[in-house]
Amino acid sequence: MKVLKLLSCIAFIIVLTSCERKYRWSPSECALQHYPARILTNNFQYKNGGGVGTLERVAGGSGWGYTGASYAVGERLKPVPDSLFVNWFSITEGKFYKGKFKLTSKKIEEALKKGQIRVYTCFAPHGRVVVYVAGKHGRAPIDRFRAIEDTSMTIAKHILKINGVKTEQEFEEKYGEKLDGSTYLKHYIKKEDSIYISKHGIPDTW
């Protein structure tokens, strides 16, 4: 009897999963023009498991609300994303942020039905995260969140990780120079960005 009930439950779950509507959409990211962010993780996860995400890269050139790179990931038709997992380095602040958020799936699905084909995450200083949809009807914000600072990660640890070494001594032996976090930051912050930030500071509302 128990076996029959278990099989019935499994069959019911399979039916629900197979009936889940899917849409044509792709993930992307963005950041403010003068406040670049190095995206470490930007994953949209499905309710029944799995998901799609973007690659690790620096965002910020497109400006707020405008999508960055286009990613042809996953199947052509995908389920509506249910949650978002993010982890990034706010370059202008020198801080790392992380968070996992429940998305307003109903709003996203309504937008996808209308022909929106891009679901993307915009990253701002102070852990601000805004999820947008975009397509033939323009773009619109769906959700706003605030991530927490990841104090376990530092610029030095990040540099060691992306260079495939474990200690500062290994870094010096490999590259013949001392690990310098300020040099790393200057590599991503343009002169015009520095001028803009010195005039306007780092705002906390988006």
Spans of features found by a protein language model:
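Sec-dependent signal peptide recognition
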Residues: 2-9
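C-terminal motif of bacterial Sec signal peptides marking the signal peptidase cleavage site
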Residues: 15-18
